[in-house]
Structures are given as C-alpha cells and as structure tokens.
Amino acid sequence: MLFSKLLPREGNFFEMFNQHADRIVEAAHAFSRLVANYSDVEKRALYNKEVDSAEQAADRITHEVNRILHTTFITPIDREQIHALINLMDDVADLIQDSAQTMALYEIGRASCRERVSSPV
C-alpha cells in the first residue's frame, strides 16, 4: 500500500515529449508559412499568432513536465535527463518564436534570390 504511493500516478513523460514535439512542428510550419508569405501583412500577422500559440502550448507542456517531475519519486529515465530534454525542446520552440519576432521587429522582408546573390558580403 505504501509502495504504491511512490509509483508515478500521473503523467506519461514520453507522451508529453511527443506532444511537445508536435507543438514544435506546428511552430516550425507556421514560421515557414510566415517566411513564404511575408509580403502579405494579414497572413504575416496570422502566422505570427500561430507561432506564438504553438510556443505558449509548448511552454505549458514544459511546465507540466517539470511539475510532475518534482512530485514523482520514480521516473522511467533519469530525472536530470527528463529535465534537460524538455528544456532543450522548449528552447527550440522559443528560438522559432524569437526568429518570428525578430523578423517583425526589424521588418525583415523576403529578399529575392537575385538580391541575395548580388548583395555584397
């Protein structure tokens, strides 16, 4: 009876890793669409919101994993590895969001291939 209280009762870490990876893919696809449609102001705003939404969902998963990690005695793999993995995954989502925000902040436009090739280095 006492031993059962030590076993993890909630949270499947691997399922949460998969959910987080799905949010990263969503953010990456939205960022890709943002870059491809950057000249369209309405689409740019829409895709920026999609990137932000996916990143915020990833943050919620990260916080949930860390909360469960601190309340679970037995974990399927080393708790430091779980902590490092989910935080590195969250860094990826953060960097995608940072890239989208930087493009908006500096009003970076989509240069044509010819402009990129002909510009001085």
Residue ranges and their predicted role:
Residues 1-119:
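Cytosolic, long alpha-helical scaffolding segments
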